[in-house]
């Protein structure tokens, strides 16, 4: 019985492995109609209007739209235009963020093979991979992308690179009866197989479904601002209603008090907050792009500052993603370390930490590994800046090792031409080659798994030698390395390849995917920043533990998570092995359920669902297109150290947003307190609606936005991340807003009462002092600087100066006086107003100098 479901199909009938003719064309066409093409299902298209409506339902955006409506009614068209522009910009950003999810799935199509070689009606044809159906007989060879999930019926020296799906950097051998999964790459050999699964039910389709079903979470900042929007809306309406009631009870006209109350609502809402956020994020994105980190959406920049956990893939992220010989042991027990980068044929040989000349025993081992080998190295070209492997990556690592030992691969192979071979097979797990020497003798070389060589009768070695080499091989394997044993002999007669004898052990070669340069230091920098680094890999637990140990993440006795246990629930687990894409999702979800803000780094197809599920996904620039499309941040230089710098940038941005909130909300609190308390001191109507809106426009506008460009504080990466549960007004910021607002209100009311007693136009004095005092606070909440450091934000000084001139102009220039309802003030009164206005800002600056206050606030008082 054959069943299908959705797009693609799965073969449930037993496959007749003896049929070489494949399907006939008619049957293939019928199955294609029944199951659909062998492609990843496209995401359901969402109408643009739905996406836009989704963005406009955000509480803060709704509050801004209400403010825009109010300012329109009041005739404050400049404010209306600014608010509408901010809403439009944020809506566009949000829609773009949703669209990129569809691109992540579309990228899976680009990973799939564009064409396939299939046998139909007994003839081999080239057909589009999308036309494959279950039951098709497909042939693949080195360099091909497997076009669908295949059940192998033939395989000759077949090795697959499954790293994009599994995260394992070592190629995997496959034999008849086993499966070759869609999207994997044939590195060596050739094979034929019957299609088992296509489209949505193939390995690629399964991951596509995970990506499609994994919706990105809202960022911590978005959650905080949404909560803030709701609170501000309720508080502003309640307090403005109280002002309205007090005025009406006091005999003021209802219409006048209604306009005043609405003006206070506008003043209490920091309508430039989205503009501040957008500017801060845009500047941060530009700085990060200059540091080779490209944010795919603006909120990713700030989210990095909230990160408490970085869940990192191993292959290609913490490691180079390329196989390399790291340690070798010659037949006399001498142990050497080999250095070098990637597959480049340059490096050094070290012993006991010191560089040494290449001894003859090591040279013989390198030569044997080079000769019993089918790989080659490809130099950099116009499209690639690094050396690359041609053939099996593990064998290419042996070629690079030989070159680092001073051997020229082409010259050496020409001097020892291969005349016979016994290819590697999964049963014996070894490869044997025979080479003719210049004196017409025969060099027999054998390489393979240690147990297949050291425990075989082909060796001519003592039991003591074999025991010592076997023990050494186990120790190297425990370090997470893949160990090969090499044996060789120079004989006079052509050997029997099926059962050679008399070979002498030449040594052991330990191959691994080495850590990137500086990876341990990067792990330390995350610890310093209070961010916990986790290692999540598809590799063997021994390999994961070894890499974790080198990074300082794991020690003997620590919990080691794996794909089939519940260690993900253990809060101390920092290393996970044998993880599948679904299990990575579970790990990320478990961390988020504990309140962590998670960044996930990766480069493979298997990382894409987790990249999308995490609070922020970070992809390597050289990784797969699928990973890059699913990520929020792409590291062009593939350097994880860039993430540490980006975390500092994210914290700077969040500090600046809080800095703006302290400034803007304190001004709103001051305005409401002046309107509420003023009548108690004989100031019947402290401010007219037009005056409130003018102060609001000048203080919340350009100066507020300029605060978003403040530089980072000293030591931003030496403090713990803020609590994920902390409100945007948390850590004392709400208290600071009230205290600062009360201080401004006290100064303003004091100046107004004094002016009233002196017979001066007190309402104009209140107007001038309120605006100048808020601008003084803007200067007081700047980022602290080291002694002697230049101020890194001259735009703020210019903005404050310009706004101060416009504020004073409101009582000096006749057209503005008529618009605002103010009276002229003399030079001496204006100087007195300016002097009094300095008090709130000066008090804040003095408070910041108190060591106890500075040490207790961290980012709560980032002013």
List where the protein language model places each region.
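Generic alpha-helical transmembrane segments
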Residues: 699, 744, 764-778
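Membrane-water interface at loop-to-transmembrane-helix junctions
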Residues: 723-741, 760-761
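Membrane-helix boundary/interface segments in integral membrane proteins
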Residues: 215-221, 773-789
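Helix-coil boundary and interhelical linker segments in multi-pass alpha-helical membrane proteins
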Residues: 679-688, 750-762
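Alpha-helical transmembrane segments and their membrane-interface junctions
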Residues: 744-758, 809, 813-818
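Alpha-helical transmembrane segments
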Residues: 651-655, 714-728, 779-792, 819-820
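Conserved cytosolic headpiece of P-type ATPases
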Residues: 1-695, 699, 703-714, 792-863
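Transmembrane helix-loop boundary segments of multi-pass membrane transporters
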Residues: 752-771, 786-796, 823
